[in-house]
Every structure is written in structure tokens, then in C-alpha cells.
Amino acid sequence: MSNVIENLGKLDRKVTLAIPKAEVEKEKQDRLVRLSKTVKMSGFRPGKVPMKMVEKQYGQQVEFEVRFDKAARKFFDITKEQDVKVAGQPKFEIKTEGVGEDEVAFDATFEVYPEVKLGDLTGAEVTRTKTEITDAEIDKTIDILRKQRVHYHVRGEAGEHGDGGGDVTAQNGDRVTLDFVGKIEGVEFAGGKAEDFPFVLGEGRMLPEFEAATLGLKVGESKSFPLSFPADYHGKDVAGKTAEFTVTLKKIEWAHLPEVNDAFAKSLGIADGNVDKMRADIRENLEREVKRRTHAMLKDQVMEALLKVSELDVPKALIEQDQERLVEMARRDLEQRGMPNAKDMPIPAEMFAQQAERRVKLGLILAEIVKAHGLEAKADQIKAEIEDFAKSYEDPKEVMRWYYGDQQRLAEMEAYVLENNVVNFVCDKAKVTDKSVSFEELTAEGNAQQA
């Protein structure tokens, strides 16, 4: 039956599309006429090729294109007229049985968007993480910043910061420079020898036995010791083997951390060097990081809750489309990491099947919530979000112009704000339990989730 949409399953549909042959032939001839004005053939000037030759050369291809174009247009008109929401792209197959002599026909199979049944959100359970930034967290951050600006002085040599104390042996925290050579069964191995090799004791850059042997040495002293490489050591040639190392210490430098004063504050971008302003700036940055992490964790909680309380079938076509998007994202990521030939790298779409299904499900659920409850991203919300984002940059006004100067970027921020509104809407309905954690616990939990 032509133009009647058949139900093949929960989401699967089929419609037969009949097109008069006369209509196809007319469109075919029109296209061939247009083509004849530009087509090039040996022995003829452009536009002077006889129509019979044009039709012989291109007629079959043009008719094929016309048939499918007509079928696609008719499919669009029928589904629009019957208010059918098509998910993904239809598949057209030429129909040969039961077709009139004066028509061509196609069977178009496709999927429709599902009905999304939103469950009772009051029964959803969500944990909301809260973290307060204390003075101790600010002090820890300052210590990290000081260590990033560490500079070293030769131990025992007097300077503006002193001589590093009376102990002239290598200690944890010192930067040492040494020569070393390692042998396995009396034979040197690749990577087992170096001269003027620097490293900081206690940072764990070297194997524990190597650092332990270096501790307590004085400049000019040598020491031999056995070192067992772990079985999972990255150097496969020596993994699981024991080597005999000899080290000779050539230089010890002690670490001098900058004092927390106006000069230190200025090095962090505080123009007048005010230490209190520096601490306030650090607090603001940490609070911004807390907001970002806690919001991401809350969003994950809300999304999991929505998946649990909602019922829907997922169109396979949408999953396949999202799989392809994820494949392209993976390729771009590899390309940005400098992977050679990333564009041509074969990445199986199947590896993203579960992720794509989850993303599509959530997209359908969120769209239903937005529609059912009239949620929207208001202009003042979008502006406030952009302003907050811009605060972390040197020139916030330039960041604002950057966003408002590109409709795609603005649309992405609008989608982000709308998603936030959904999260807030769900939290207003659900059972929310607040959980207080330290900044250290927050970062550890966030890093574990990313891993």
C-alpha cells in the first residue's frame, strides 16, 4: 500500500513510495538538458554535444539520481504530513513486486523517536558533594607554588640565601649530580650509564635502591650496590634482572624556596604585591575548581538517577550516528596528541556502543524534561555563566567578545546552561543528601572517576 506507514515493531516503520514514471522521465530530461550545456565530450564544443549522446552517456545515472531524489522528497512530505518523528536516516530499497507499469516504487524503512516515560523524580536519590576552602588549603597551594619556583644552590658555598647548612651529605630534597654505570653479569647495558646526571632525591624519579644508595654520600665519594629491576619495569631487556651499579657523586645542591612576600605575590600576577590579595585570589581559584568538580559529580549523579527512573526504547540509528561522532572525536584527539596518520587510523565503532547508547538515552530524556516542564536557558543565565568562566582569564572582556562573536560557541553555552537547569530541576524534586568532603578528598575522588 502506497503512502501508508506500517508498524514493524516498537520503533521500526516502513512506507511504500510510488512515483509516476512520467514524473521521473520529465525530471530526468530536464536535468539532461541542463547537463548538456556544460558537459564536455571529445570532438564537441561545450554545450554543443547532441542530446542523444548526452543521454546515452549519462541517462542511466541521472535517472537513478532522480528516482532516489523523488523518493526522498516524497518520504519527507509523507512523514511531515502524518507528523511522524523520524530518527536517523531512512533506508530506501527499490520495490519490484506489486508495482504498476506506469510507476516506480521504493520501500523506505526507518525508525521513529520513542515515547519517553519519565518516572517519579521524588523517588530518585542524589548525593551532593560540598567542599569549603580553608586557610590550610590555601597554605598547601602556596607551598605547591613555592616548590614550582624552587631554585638550587651548591651546598656549602656561601650565597645570599646561605650555604644550606653544615651537613654536606646528600639528603632528601637535594638535587644531586652524579656519574653512574650499571652492569649485568659484568656487561654494561643500554641506558645503564650516564655522566653528569641530575635528579632530586626523594621525588621517586629513580628506583628506591638507587636513591637509598645515593643518600648520605659526599661530593667525590663513590658507592657500588646491587639493584633489582622490577618484573614490570619499562625496559624489557633488564626487567626482572639484578644489576651492579657504581655511582660517583659530583655535586650537591640544596633547594631554596622563595619566601611568601610581595615579590612572590607579584610573581603570581598580583600587581601591588599584596599578600592578602594573593591569598584571596588563590581562594577564588580554588573555589572555582570546587564548583567545577562538585557540579560535574552532581551532574553524573543526576544523569544516573534519570536513567534509573525513565523508560524508553533507543533507536539504533541514533546510536550508530553517535558512535560515528565518537569515532571522529577519538581521531581528533589522537591527531591533537601528535599521533601520525590519525585521520586514517581504523577505530572500530563497536567500542563506543555502550557509551553511545547512554548518551542517546540521556539526550532523549533531557529533551523530554525540557519539553514537559518548559525549561529554557535564559539570556541572563548564559551571560552570568560566560562572565564566571571569563574571570579566570587575564582579559575577561575579550573572552566575553569571543563567546558573543560566534553563534556556535554561544549555542554550546546555551546547551550547557539548559543542562544545568535540568540538573537543578531534578535536585528540587529528588531526595538529595549533602556530603561534606575536604578539597584533597574531592580532587582524589574526581581523579579516580576520570581514570
From Swiss-Prot:
GO terms for biological process: 'de novo' cotranslational protein folding; cell division; chaperone-mediated protein folding; protein transport; protein unfolding. It is found in: Cytoplasm. Disulfide bonds: none annotated. Pfam families: FKBP_C, Trigger_C, Trigger_N. Keywords: Cell cycle, Cell division, Chaperone, Cytoplasm, Isomerase, Rotamase. Its main location: cytoplasm. InterPro entries: PPIase_dom_sf (IPR046357), PPIase_FKBP_dom (IPR001179), Trig_fac (IPR005215), Trigger_fac_C (IPR008880), Trigger_fac_C_sf (IPR037041), Trigger_fac_ribosome-bd_bac (IPR008881), Trigger_fac_ribosome-bd_sf (IPR036611), Trigger_fact/SurA_dom_sf (IPR027304). It is an enzyme of class 5 (isomerase). Its EC number is 5.2.1.8. Gene3D superfamilies: 3.10.50.40, Trigger factor ribosome-binding domain, Trigger factor, C-terminal domain. GO terms for molecular function: peptidyl-prolyl cis-trans isomerase activity; protein folding chaperone; ribosome binding. It catalyses: [protein]-peptidylproline (omega=180) = [protein]-peptidylproline (omega=0). Residues 173-258 form the PPIase FKBP-type domain. GO terms for cellular component: cytoplasm. HAMAP family: Trigger_factor_Tig. Belongs to the FKBP-type PPIase family. Tig subfamily. Involved in protein export. Acts as a chaperone by maintaining the newly synthesized protein in an open conformation. Functions as a peptidyl-prolyl cis-trans isomerase. PANTHER family: TRIGGER FACTOR CHAPERONE AND PEPTIDYL-PROLYL CIS/TRANS ISOMERASE, TRIGGER FACTOR-LIKE PROTEIN TIG, CHLOROPLASTIC. Consists of 3 domains; the N-terminus binds the ribosome, the middle domain has PPIase activity, while the C-terminus has intrinsic chaperone activity on its own. This is Trigger factor. It comes from Cupriavidus pinatubonensis (strain JMP 134 / LMG 1197). The lineage of its organism: Bacteria, Pseudomonadati, Pseudomonadota, Betaproteobacteria, Burkholderiales.
